[in-house]
Amino acid sequence: MMKLNLFINANETESYIDIHAPKMNDHVQSIINAVNDLDKSHTLVGYIDKEIHIINVSDVITFQVINKNVTAITSNQKFKLKLRLYELEKQLPQHFIRISKSEIVNKYYIEKLLLEPNGLIRMYLKDAHYTYSSRRFLKSIKERLSI
């Protein structure tokens, strides 16, 4: 059971969080990730032709580079973004995983994984398509998915 203490002090110049734990474990790490995600962007601006759309980041299945443009793919739309993939990666919550030079996936939309004989991971996503990880990102993917 986790204990929570809140201290309100008008003399404090900024808000901060201290975590006290007997050891680092998955529960503590998930709290750290949740706190870090508070500063991350939860909406993005995307474009379809000349229309401007506000996209909820949690609705995005994957971000892919298509024809040198970063594209946010949801279950029913594809939006062009004006960000580079590396810029986007810094803004996204922890549940987005870089799987290749040209793709970032939302781990909540990963349905299953297939380890290929060549060492790559084939990721089946909930929108009924699949994608491949690159070997360069394999170690990071395994760590982020705890496999």
UniProtKB/Swiss-Prot annotation:
Q: Where in the cell is it found?
A: Cytoplasm
The membrane spanning regions, by residue number, are none
Going by the entry's taxonomy, the superkingdom of the source organism is recorded as Bacteria
What GO cellular component is one of the record's annotations? cytoplasm
Q: Which PROSITE patterns match?
A: HTH_LYTTR
The main location class comes to cytoplasm
Keyword list, A-Z = Cytoplasm, DNA-binding, Transcription, Transcription regulation
| InterPro entries, sorted | LytR-like, LytTR_DNA-bd_dom
As one GO molecular function, the record gives: phosphorelay response regulator activity
Domain HTH LytTR-type intervals: 44-147
Q: Known Gene3D superfamilies for this protein?
A: LytTr DNA-binding domain (2.40.50.1020)
Task: Tell me which Pfam families the record gives.
Answer: LytTR
Concerning PANTHER family, the annotation shows: HTH LYTTR-TYPE DOMAIN-CONTAINING PROTEIN, TRANSCRIPTIONAL REGULATOR-RELATED
Q: What is this protein called?
A: Uncharacterized HTH-type transcriptional regulator SAR2449
